[in-house]
Curated annotation (Swiss-Prot):
UniProt GO molecular function: ribosome binding; rRNA binding; translation initiation factor activity
Cystine crosslinks: none
PANTHER family recorded: TRANSLATION INITIATION FACTOR IF-1, CHLOROPLASTIC
Protein name, per record: Translation initiation factor IF-1
UniProt cross-references to Pfam families, sorted A to Z: eIF-1a (PF01176)
Subunit description: Component of the 30S ribosomal translation pre-initiation complex which assembles on the 30S ribosome in the order IF-2 and IF-3, IF-1 and N-formylmethionyl-tRNA(fMet); mRNA recruitment can occur at any time during PIC assembly.
Location(s), subcellular: Cytoplasm
SUPFAM superfamilies: Nucleic acid-binding proteins
Organism: Dichelobacter nodosus (strain VCS1703A)
Length: 72
């Protein structure tokens, strides 16, 4: 799957779950479970409840996503 097929949305972290999973509320009101991308894990970027994040989602499963950027 190429990078162009992924859907990129913004949202807010509303809950921290075990195993570096987060519940994110998207701007359109939907809630999804998301995990941290490997690059964010490598650079020890911390994500807290209330942070604005960019989430990448695949069109095949719209209930899961990958956090790729934490906005300041």
């Amino acid at each position: 799957m190429s990078k162009e097929e992924n859907i990129e949305l913004t949202g807010t972290v509303i809950e921290t779950l075990p195993n570096t999973m987060f519940r994110v509320e998207l701007e359109n009101g939907h809630q999804i479970n998301a995990h941290i991308s490997g690059r964010m894990r490598k650079h020890y970027i911390r994500i807290l409840t209330g942070d604005k994040v960019k989430v990448e989602m695949t069109p095949y499963d719209l209930s899961k996503g990958r956090i790729v950027f934490r906005e300041k």
